[in-house]
Amino acid sequence: MEGRYLVLSDVHCREWVAESARALMDQHGLHEVVLLGDITHFGPPQFAEDFIKALGAKCYAVPGNCDPPGTLTFIESSAISLHGRKVVVNGRTWGGLGGSNPSIFRTPSEMPEEEIFRSLSPVMERGMVLVLHCPAHGTFDTPFSNKHVGSTAVRDLIRRTEPLVVLSGHIHEDRGVAQKEGVWYMNPGAAKDRYAGMMELGEEVKLTLLDLEV
């Protein structure tokens, strides 16, 4: 079996999430965490390191659009950063990208679609685990406006490369699990809203939505 992982996104500086996540890890026998960004809420960047250390587990992470640029340094000091890079985890390539495409909110870590494409292209491999903050356009990317706001660059790269699993957050309102054209997708929901997920990789992929206890 490749591994079992707690998946968290959109903590937005809620300190209580770390304790609740530890309890969930104990309950499900999990020892590693995937963080999908927006660990802070427009800072302070140091919170990312403090939060990751409070989890007490090995972490793989990308920053979110609400994480100021300096946050990446603190992620790199306390977790395995997947922002614009890839690593091999239990024999499978994992890679990712943080931040998001442009939004109406003009948050600190947004980038144009062209930059997303350039940054993510070297990371992509068929059959990989893709760890993102921003979702692909058309998949778990619909806020209350009911308009798709995900990245077209991410969507196009997924279609071209066919990863095994795509994990993303960012859109708090569009939580779920789906399989489309052979690719598994999960948005675990916002941890600040007491939501989480679990990824199990082995002979089969199993993605499960979980709830955090306050």
PLM segments and residue spans:
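Conserved hydrophobic/aromatic beta-strand scaffold that supports enzyme active sites
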Residues: 86, 96, 131, 177, ...
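Active-site-proximal beta-strand elements of phosphoester/diester hydrolases
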Residues: 2-12, 91-100, 129-133, 185-189, ...
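Active-site environment of divalent metal-dependent phosphoester hydrolases
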Residues: 12-17, 40-46, 65-72, 88, ...
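Conserved beta-sheet core of the metallophosphoesterase superfamily
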Residues: 60, 142-203
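Core catalytic region of metal-dependent phosphoesterases/phosphodiesterases
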Residues: 4, 8-89
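Active-site charged/polar residues at nucleotide-handling catalytic sites that mediate phosphoryl
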Residues: 28, 125, 161
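Conserved catalytic scaffold of divalent metal-dependent phosphoesterases
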Residues: 13-16, 66-153
